[in-house]
Amino acid sequence: GWVSLNDSHNQMVVHWAGEKSNVIVALARDSLSLLGPKNSDVYISYDYGKSFKKISERFSFGDGNSSAVAIAQFYHSPANNQRYIFVDAFVPYLWITTDFCKSIQGFSIPFRAADLLLHSRNPNLVLGFDRSHPNKQLWKSDDFGQTWIMIQEHVKSFSWGVEPYDKPNTVYIERHEPSGTSTVIRSTDFFQSRENKEVILEDVDDFQLRDKYLFATKAVRLLGSLQPSSVQLWVSFNRKPMRVAQFVTKHPIKEYYIADASEDQVFVCVSHDDNRTNLYISEAEGLKFSLSLENVLYYSPGGAGSDTLVRYFANEPFADFHRVEGVRGVYIATLLNGSFSEENMRSVITFDKGGTWEPLQPPAETRYGEKTHCELSQGCSLHLAQRLSQLLNFQLRRMPILSKESAPGLIIATGSIGKSMAKKTNVYISSSAGARWREALSGPHYYTWGDHGGILVAIAQGTETDQLKYSTNEGETWKSFTFSEKPVFVYGLLTEPGEKSTIFTIFGSYKENGHSWLILQVNTSDVLGVPCTENDYKLWSPSDERGNECLLGHKTVFKRRTPHATCFNGEDFDRPVMVSNCSCTREDFECDFGFKLSEDLSLEVCVPDPEFAGKPYDPPVPCPVGSTYRRTRGYRKISGDTCMGGDIESRLEGEMLPCPLAEENEFILYATRYSIHRYDLASGLSQELPLAGLRGAVALDFDYEHNCLYWADVTLDIIQRLCLNGSSGQEIIISTGLETVEALAFEPLSQLLYWVNAGIPKIEVANPDGDLRLTVLNSSVLERPRALALVPREGLMFWTDWGDSRPGIYRSDMDGSLAACIVSEGVRWPNGISVDDHWIYWTEAYMDRIERVDFNGLQRSVILDSLPHPYAIAVFKNEIYWNDWSQLSIFRASKNSGSRMETLVGRLYGIMDMKIFYRGKTTGQNACIAHPCSLLCLPKSNNGRSCKCPEGVSSTVLPSGEVKCDCPHGYSMKNNTCVKEENTCLPNQYRCFNGNCINSIWQCDNNNDCGDMSDEKNCPTTVCDAETQFRCRESGTCIPLSYKCDLEDDCGDNSDESHCEAHQCRKDEFSCSSGMCIRLSWRCDDDNDCRDWSDEANCTMFRTCEASSFQCLNGHCIPQRWACDGDADCQDGSDEDPTICEKKCNGFQCPNGTCISTSKHCNGITDCADASDEQDCEIPLCTRYMDFVCKNRQQCLSHSMVCDGDIQCEDGSDEDANYAGCAQEPEFHRTCDQFSFQCANGVCISLVWKCDGMDDCGDYSDEASCENPTDAPTCSRYYQFQCGNGHCIPNQWKCDGENDCGDWSDEKECEGSPLLPITTAVPPTCLPNHFRCGSGACITNSWVCDGYRDCADGSDEDACPTSHPNVTSSPPAPRGRCSRTEFECQQLHKCIPNWKRCDGRRDCQDGTDERSCPTHSSLSCPQGYRCEDGEACLLATERCDGYLDCSDGSDERNCTDDTIVYKVQNLQWTADFSGAITLTWARPKRMSSTSCVYNVYYRMVGESIWKVLETHSNKTSSVLKVLKPDCTYQVKVQVQCLSRVYNTNDFITLRVPEGLPDAPFNLQLALKKEAEGVVLCSWSAPVNAHGLIREP
């Protein structure tokens, strides 16, 4: 259809209302730059452009005169598509409509509305800007423009905030200041109150808001200079405070232009003084920029290009830079080498978001099949017209590059091939996201597409025409359609935004009548035929076009209509997108800030940029203590890149380091197997250290001077180190020859690390780096050594040994000499040991007590007894600290009497080693300080020393008898001492043994990069899981087993494709060169389906079509039904060959034999002589609103009639679950019993746990909506009592007559309780039982008047009585009584040492010392397995399961077929795009792969019954498709070998991603009485939301 408007205005603005509305609004106006009076006309269409009605008479100034109205612009409400505002160009007047222009109201307003900004969610809220007013006023309307109030003046720019980054009514303005600069201000109440107004940045030149980013520029002036020396770019990400962005360049910066900020990364054009513009790219926060592309084309009205003709056509800056929509990471840019002319313009493209750029691949042939003779190697490529080309060719402006989300990978552009843009232009099309191009049309054209790219249309530019060209195969072939009775001079070709419709609108005029607007509409739906079926689609990925498996770390697969399938997708086609992650490769990384590619680009190595003056390896500022940062190796992952894993990632991504920590306070370090914590004694705060991969951390120590932590992992049998000052990351220093390291001790004076290698047994020593190692003691002295303590100043070493034959406390010099047992009586299971002031303290687990003795084994006494299971011990000042395995806590008490016992930390599951550190602990002298040795210097008693050589190092004996070591490799002799050579390599480099420095990326890559092979030594051997992975031959990389024999070289050496069985393709398949089979119809369709292009090789006019298709003589394929239908569908007309069609009619045959096209059947026009083609046409055609096609292809239904419980399709397909996708019935919802509370996550807990202050549900729902919220208790609910001061004590200490709490609260409310003493309240600024120093710091009360200056001002030792707290002495025993360290026998009142009490021997004549003794037994494990050392209870399933759970390894010894337990390892889960959960695991150790299978179980959290998902599978992965979206499940995998099932309680908890909600129900419509034509729609929420239903 066509409409002549009889309108001669020279501009027309058209708007589709959208949201499936048929309304189109058009404004015809004169350009404001033209001389003479101005007026305008408004037109509206209610039938989607078939007809237009002129409504200009409705726009008047209130006096009925509409001729003087000159509407400059109209605005459409994004919140309500029926609302429009029209604004006059010269008069402060506007018109509004809320019903698609059916009624229009005019209002005089107090300002000239140069710009309006309508709110995205509130349809009544509008901002208006008066640029013509001297004060640049900003106004606001709350009633859609009827009334206005002024909210700000001196406004330069304004914008709404963007949700969710801003509150709903946030407004940003850039306000002019008298200084000439601007201030950026944000307000959430339209500047009504000061508290809701915030200054974002001052002294700003320009400001811009882009979604999550804020950008501003500021000129920085030098002192004494009137000219700006440089311009700064300030950036805010996610509304954080604005910060200055950093650019690595030595050139002065003149201007910034934000080219793109759409993919969590910012492209910025930076213009320099010499008019050269470079393109930079940032990390996600937009603060650190690296160079991406030089000499990019950029125009600025006051800068680059302002002296060219472009200044007459462009008043805003721009860059020739296009983001290819629909795919990630693809951009096209224009390079400018010289002046602003097309001879100096070239196009380049990037597929990795600016990591690398390359010329566009030119097509090999023209559209007529002639060779182009354009080769990249000769500097010839394809160049595409962008903004500058359009402006330079102002008489015939070239169309911009067209790419849209509606058709991923499809690009149409105007361009030319050659060495620059200055060639004849044609239309070029790419179906591969820019990887390949073909010439589609000769000469410039208008173009667009519809039906999600299913149909392309074009019209020739610059001439009169009546022909519309269209293509249904992505521009491979074109047909023509006569759209007008006579030629039309075309101004433009448009379709509704979104490119989903098949209706196109042509704007033009008949030339002979002068300019008069003509609107013509073409509906191309008949061309596409029937709806597409699954056979009409194929899966396509942009990465396939590049020959890579992945782009930007993942493979995105789109469902795309095949080029030669002629069918329609439909407006509601929801294109499925599948995304899968990939392992990292070098292409996933770019050079980090401060680095650049080396001059030899083929190496792809990033090296430090000499122009960068910063320190790229330093920690960031700020770097909070307790957090970590990634120290660069010169590379950074491209922003938005999602790759994970692989050898390259670990080499390039940088090492994680803790933020530097300057230790000041005294603190405890304790290990809990899977973590190590730091407990500050002054503040009482506990903090987990940033460590990774801990499996069995049982021993630790700390180098206070260098701030380095050492720990041993008995599960991995390694010793590791992490320096908290940021000097290095977590590193393994010893990994060989270790077997159950149970103790570590760092010697700070000589810088030596000692450890107990209990499984061998040995006590060994090494330097801090672990490369100089020596055995000090072996099995000749040791039996089952456990703990170790050093006295460096005395040269002594003490350890505990709990072997069966000679348990005791031992002492030797630190070189292992003079070893002797100093305590052997009454010792059975000595655990921890600590030394303080010539006293040795140890925990005795069998006797359940803590004892002490002096260095000679004398003056032995029991400090505490009746302890459930003491383990590690430490001494600090006047107190002992220990942890207890049974009570899961760390305790403190007096080191002399055991009094004042208190709990410091509770709920410590798996608590192991513990040590205390403080400033001054490492000070002192010994013989090694004054007289060092050549390598290892071991202190001895009596101020002696022993020079030792590490194992494997040769030595010589000097005349003095001293041993001198030869310096090993990497050490050099200086002053008779072997000194480690300094590492002069950068952190991103590896130092070879020969001193060379190589890039760290080259280490362990199977190449001799060092020259001495040292970079390939000690490389970890990649162990691949034989059940799920394949190991590549050369690289050793593990790839999924599914990649084996898939006809793709995934390894790079083709080893994954060797020894594969030959595969025969079917008759309907094509065999690729690699052996892969693809559908025969995909041959020669211009898609790289074989991934080696063999399906597109030798494609000429000969082509094989499917059986359901007709093959034209030129080789093209068309649907069989198009042959002999009266239309020439083949370009050569061979489908209508009379010799074939005389016998056949594939269209509609009239009774007289005439064959007409199928499209002419039932089209409302009589074509047969007897009108039979329009008879029996009761079946309606599918429209945009009736777009559900029944399976029988005979009926069309509205989507509201599908899956509604009623069958409307004759074949019932509208209610078919598979065809229509109808949801299943919701399953039964589980409820808890009357004595339980049901958590929000479905878990049932005891009702008494509701509102008790503890998170028993795991999601805090049991503590929500409590009338009197309870503070979370710090004590165990079951076996501890919480004192009034917050301390925790065992329940049995309650009401025992002793002040265990310290505030007597444990003795309150006791039967017959005595009068309690009155205590003084603790100052409120410190914790209970803490002292407040004069400086305000808090210390524990026990440190006051203890002889140590713990407060910085010494106030804790002021006004103290004269005493010597550090001198330990026992008070004299009263006459007739034993001393405090003795036990008094009941008869004869004999005194014996208290350590002899309960030692199993009768020392009192009456035997009273062995009465009322605790049971001398280890832990009782009635339902599990007890370790042989008696120190831990295990579940029965943890015995012989392949993991060392006992510290003595007894749980994995003497395993038989009857006791062995098979457990899967590394059970993990991932969710894909569709919501399916993939479960993966590793085979158990020692398990046979032939007779054992896996059973997979699952249950929803809160359920007690496990459901079977999969049984008797030999795969180590499983896909869970039965789980409900947005629900939490527990999943476990059990092993079954023959008939035996190995039960396990090990499960993982996972949460299924949100899914699509069910359809809403109870849909109702009602007319709104007070508003004519308004329909109110209401509905009930779906039964199953499958997640959070969000607003669109």
Curated annotation (Swiss-Prot):
The keyword Glycoprotein applies. It is found in: Golgi apparatus membrane; Golgi apparatus, trans-Golgi network membrane; Endosome membrane; Early endosome membrane. Disulfide bonds join 985-997, 992-1010, 1004-1019, 1024-1038, 1032-1051, 1045-1060, 1065-1077, 1072-1090, 1084-1099, 1105-1117, 1112-1130, 1124-1141, 1145-1155, 1150-1168, 1162-1177, 1182-1196, 1190-1209, 1203-1222, 1232-1244, 1239-1257, 1251-1266, 1275-1288, 1283-1301, 1295-1310, 1326-1338, 1333-1351, 1345-1360, 1378-1391, 1385-1404, 1398-1413, 1421-1433, 1427-1446, 1440-1455. CDD domains: FN3, LDLa. SUPFAM superfamilies: Fibronectin type III (SSF49265), LDL receptor-like module (SSF57424), Oligoxyloglucan reducing end-specific cellobiohydrolase (SSF110296), YWTD domain (SSF63825). This is Sortilin-related receptor. Residues 983-1021, 1022-1062, 1063-1100, 1103-1142, 1144-1179, 1180-1224, 1230-1268, 1273-1312, 1324-1362, 1376-1415, 1419-1457 form the LDL-receptor class A domain. Glycans are attached at residues 6, 65, 275, 337, 523, 581, 725, 778, 975, 1098, 1152, 1366, 1454, 1514. BNR repeats lie at residues 43-54, 139-150, 348-359, 428-439, 469-480. Within the Golgi apparatus, the propeptide is cleaved off by FURIN or a furin-like protease. At the cell surface, partially subjected to proteolytic shedding that releases the ectodomain in the extracellular milieu. Following shedding, may be cleaved the remaining transmembrane fragment and catalyze the release of a C-terminal fragment in the cytosol and of a soluble N-terminal beta fragment in the extracellular milieu. The C-terminal cytosolic fragment localizes to the nucleus. Residues 933-979 form the EGF-like domain. Residues 1463-1555, 1559-1592 form the Fibronectin type-III domain. Belongs to the VPS10-related sortilin family. SORL1 subfamily. PANTHER family: SORTILIN RELATED, SORTILIN-RELATED RECEPTOR. LDL-receptor class B repeats lie at residues 707-750, 751-794, 795-839, 840-877, 878-920. It comes from the Eukaryota. Expressed in brain, and, at lower levels, in testis and adrenal gland. It is a single-pass type I membrane protein. Its main location: Golgi. Sorting receptor that directs numerous proteins to their correct location within the cell. Along with AP-1 complex, involved Golgi apparatus - endosome sorting. Sorting receptor for APP, regulating its intracellular trafficking and processing into amyloidogenic-beta peptides. Retains APP in the trans-Golgi network, hence preventing its transit through late endosomes where amyloid beta peptides Abeta40 and Abeta42 are generated. The keyword Ion transport does not apply. One of its GO terms (biological process) is post-Golgi vesicle-mediated transport. GO terms for cellular component: early endosome; early endosome membrane; endoplasmic reticulum; endoplasmic reticulum membrane; endosome; extracellular region; Golgi apparatus; Golgi membrane. InterPro entries: 6-blade_b-propeller_TolB-like (IPR011042), FN3_dom (IPR003961), FN3_sf (IPR036116), Ig-like_fold (IPR013783), LDL_receptor-like_sf (IPR036055), LDLR_class-A_CS (IPR023415), LDLR_classB_rpt (IPR000033), LDrepeatLR_classA_rpt (IPR002172). Keywords: Cell membrane, Cytoplasmic vesicle, Disulfide bond, EGF-like domain, Endocytosis, Endoplasmic reticulum, Endosome, Glycoprotein, Golgi apparatus, Membrane, Receptor, Repeat, Secreted, Transport.
